[in-house]
Amino acid sequence: MDEFFEKVKSQQDPFKRLASLIPGFGGYIERQNRRDADKLLRDTVARRFDEQWKRTSQLQVEMVSSGMIQYVDDMERAALQLRTFIDKISTAPRGYSGLFDAVKINEKELEAIYQYDAAFFDLGEQVARALDHVEASLGDREALPAAIRNVTSLARTAVETYNRRSEVVIGDGK
């Protein structure tokens, strides 16, 4: 998230830079920048997962065209899990009070949040590879069910990871 935070900070208008010199106002600007960086990060993750969701839908069309209708429902479960994750991460409120309202941020919590954020990008790559495997397995009716289950499992993991990140952000994480 540091990369996103620095990007937001560098795009700050001159008025905000000047106002950040006013005592107390700098904390406000800092919170706003963190909120903006968090939103930018979540939008980026959502776009990457949306690409995979579209691939999932396209694979369903290919299954129907190839007469593999019996696998479409399983693939739909994977698509629904992906869509659930995309909707959660893209529609979450901009900034959370537990993370953004305090001027001083707990480094341990921030590190945990960064780890979850990195996990989202890793999960996106894993989903892409799993969908590659589904696509490669379209001709192998024995391997296809396991490949689809893997996509569903990874999509479910993305939703669970988002929920755990939210717990850390709002202060309910253990």
What are the functions of these language-model segments?
Residues 137-174:
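Preference for long, well-ordered alpha-helical segments
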Residues 1-60:
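Leu/Val/Ala/Ile-rich N-terminal alpha-helices, chiefly Sec-type signal peptides and the beginnings
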Residues 54-147:
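Charged linear interaction tracts used for macromolecular binding and regulation
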